[in-house]
Amino acid sequence: MQTDNTKSNTNKTAKQEWGSFAFVICIALLIRILIMEPFNVPTGSMKATILENDYIFSTKYSYGYSNYSLSFFDFIPLFKGRIFAREPDRGDIVVFRPPNDMSVRYIKRLIGLPGDKIQLIDDVIYINDKKIERTEVGTYISEEGIKYLKFKETLPNGRTYFSYKLAPIYGVIYNDRYSNTDVFYVPEGQYFFLGDNRDQSNDSRVNLGFVPFENFIAKAQFIWFSTKITWWDNDIGVINLVLKLKPWIESVRLNRIFRNLYNTDA
């Protein structure tokens, strides 16, 4: 027979366990909201720095906090502007809400700061009428077999990174309007972004336009996981998910796991 004492101890233990569980959940949520958040990248606009189905970790505190950077609460207008704001640097890879579609998140490289004059001439970036250093360093063949020319670029602050351009086919250059642009004057409080995949990126040269500082969510830091194919899909059903599990595991890109996004040794 269970005594009142035993019942009391059982209830106390259950409460302690639930309390511990709730505490862990709260800590995890706080970490995600304030410190670090994982993101999945579904598109190739940053290829080959970031590939489709790369999973990245980003730091939320790098630029301070705005309404858009607070996970789970970004749909509630809690406040305007940023608190604990820190200025971004040229060359940062930033996760942000595009001003023309707040339902999605973009990831691009920050090129232009407030007050800058930006233009691309024959694929070379000019910042305040000075062209950046740009050297062709080889080629990149994508998983789909598409050939890209690979360039090493250096921004005025010394930040270096790789950009990629579709190789000409029979001498024909792909998407010349991306290679030669109008002049862009970056307004105060806003920023100019480019994708590292220069011919296949919806960035500040075209539909995106300038991005307000308030729309910044986080600074991308490193890849923590990567696969060639997507496993989870709400539309394919449980049986197909099970069948897809093995090829998904086999598609893991082991050479990309824990890759620093700012490493230019590769």
Curated annotation (Swiss-Prot):
The chain crosses the membrane at residues 21-41. Keywords: Cell membrane, Hydrolase, Membrane, Protease, Transmembrane, Transmembrane helix. Its EC number is 3.4.21.89. One of its GO terms (cellular component) is plasma membrane. Gene3D superfamilies: Umud Fragment, subunit A. Residues 1-20 are cytoplasmic. Coiled coil: none annotated. It catalyses: Cleavage of hydrophobic, N-terminal signal or leader sequences from secreted and periplasmic proteins. Its main location: membrane. It is found in: Cell membrane. One of its GO terms (molecular function) is serine-type endopeptidase activity. Signal peptide: none annotated. The keyword Cell wall biogenesis/degradation does not apply. The keyword tRNA-binding does not apply. Residues 42-266 are extracellular. One of its GO terms (biological process) is signal peptide processing. It is a single-pass type II membrane protein. It is an enzyme of class 3 (hydrolase). The active site is at S45, K108. InterPro entries: LexA/Signal_pep-like_sf, Pept_S26A_signal_pept_1, Pept_S26A_signal_pept_1_CS, Pept_S26A_signal_pept_1_Lys-AS, Peptidase_S26. This is Signal peptidase I. It comes from Rickettsia conorii (strain ATCC VR-613 / Malish 7).
